[in-house]
Swiss-Prot record:
Keywords: Calcium, Collagen, Disulfide bond, Extracellular matrix, Gaseous exchange, Glycoprotein, Hydroxylation, Lectin, Metal-binding, Repeat, Secreted, Signal, Surface film. The gene is Sftpa1. This is Pulmonary surfactant-associated protein A. Glycans are attached at residue 207. It comes from Rattus norvegicus (Rat). Residues 31-99 are annotated as: Disordered.
Length: 248
């Protein structure tokens, strides 16, 4: 058989084995796989993936440049709370002795001027009848009339004491002030627990008296002593208003 006849016979055999449906679509047997094709063109970029975990820290970089200039001073802060009181220090060394006061001419001049001013003031007040000097005592009044306790407080605040005569001369000085102001004067003494016995405010016993005849006769009910304008004394209650006279 020639090659052409053999080929034709095979063709008919293949055609005879093919089944066709009424739609004239024939289903052939799977053919032999062809050779792989060439690579296609690159596809488009895909979507961004999910964020990954942080990587490990990188190595330390090289040193930086030179440090900058110092900045300006800031504003002062608020004062802090006071600290605790420290311990008392040791006494310092004794200083050199100073010059005697009588050698300081400037000090002597100042003292002389002060003394002169005091004497002038005392002279003016004496002329007004509000102050009298007897020995080393000075008796003075501000012209107010108040009770015994108030007079005592006023005199203490002024640096003195309520006036009390301890000699006839002092008694006369206080009496002249009482007569000038036409008012009785409380004296700086008070009755003891024993009626008729009196003592000074410092606790000492009275060593000079000038009672009006028949006085004292308060029988313990009149604890204070007043001076009349003629200089005589009388025991009296301490709540009356009398001229305030102090002694310095």
């Amino acid at each position: 058989m020639s090659l052409c006849s053999l080929a034709f016979t095979l063709f008919l055999t293949v055609v005879a084995g093919i089944k066709c449906n009424v739609t004239d679509v024939c289903a052939g047997s799977p053919g032999i796989p062809g050779a792989p094709g060439n690579h296609g063109l690159p596809g488009r970029d895909g979507r961004d993936g999910v964020k990954g975990d942080p990587g490990p820290p990188g190595p330390m970089g090289p040193p930086g440049g030179m440090p900058g200039l110092p900045g300006r001073d800031g504003l002062p802060g608020a004062p802090g709370a006071p600290g605790e009181r420290g311990d008392k220090g040791e006494p310092g060394e004794r200083g050199l002795p100073g010059f005697p006061a009588y050698l300081d001419e400037e000090l002597q001049t100042e003292l002389y001027e002060i003394k002169h001013q005091i004497l002038q003031t005392m002279g003016v007040l004496s002329l007004q009848g509000s102050m009298l000097s007897v020995g080393d005592k000075v008796f003075s009044t501000n012209g107010q009339s108040v009770n015994f306790d108030t007079i005592k407080e006023m005199c203490t605040r002024a640096g003195g004491n309520i006036a009390v005569p301890r000699t006839p001369e002092e008694n006369e000085a206080i009496a002249s002030i009482a007569k000038k102001y036409n008012n009785y004067v409380y004296l700086g003494m008070i009755e003891d627990q024993t009626p008729g016995d009196f003592h000074y405010l410092d606790g000492a016993s009275v060593n000079y008296t000038n009672w009006y005849p028949g006085e004292p006769r308060g029988q313990g009910k009149e604890k204070c002593v007043e001076m009349y304008t003629d200089g005589t004394w009388n025991d009296r209650g301490c709540l009356q208003y009398r001229l305030a006279v102090c002694e310095f």
